[in-house]
Amino acid sequence: LVSYLRRNFPGALYHSVYEAGFSGFWIHDQLREKGIDCIVVNPADVPTKDKERTKKRDPVDCRKLARSLRSGELEGIYVPCRLKLEDRSLIRTRLSMVRKQTRCKNQIKGMLLFYGIHLPEELINSHWSRRFIRWLERIRMEKASGNIALKAHLEELKHLRKIIAALNRAIL
């Protein structure tokens, strides 16, 4: 793209735009490195006609973005640097792992309730302490299949706890 522009339009100022989405900001960064002005816009901020809304296709979207860029109707969003994006990824990953851990704990509690296994009085308020997990590990179901299922949930929980601890250390 850059060589085509420089070959066919030497000395021109190049401007580009794209809608923010799943692909992140790496395209923005690369275009800027090559000397092409680039803005990233919120898709909801792009002026759209009813006809364009009903015929949502790439060629229609491209023309709409080009027309809006040329007329100065677009305002770019803030594009964070790569380091900030990676920090955000770390925080999002931790949040995702905490949600998985919560789901895993709920599955274990559900399994205990399903089989009528009640917590001992001394562990009711222990909130997933080591002692509570040791108690869970000592539970024996009537069949090997039940033991395997419970053990799988407990192993997943321990694995998630290790991951979250490592993420917490990385964040601090």
Stretch-by-stretch model annotation:
Residues 17-26:
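Acidic, metal-coordinating catalytic cores used for nucleic-acid/nucleotide bond scission
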Residues 1-15:
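Short, basic/hydrophobic alpha-helical segments
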Residues 39-80, 85, 127, 132-135:
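Short alpha-helix plus adjacent loop in nuclease-associated cores
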Residues 64-108, 114:
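Extended, highly charged alpha-helical segments
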Residues 92-172:
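Glycine-rich, often acidic, oxyanion-interacting loops/wings at catalytic, nucleic-acid
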Residues 25-39, 67:
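TOPRIM-like Mg2+-dependent DNA-processing core and adjacent phosphate-binding/basic surface
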Residues 32-38, 54-59, 112-121:
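A short alpha->loop->secondary-structure connector
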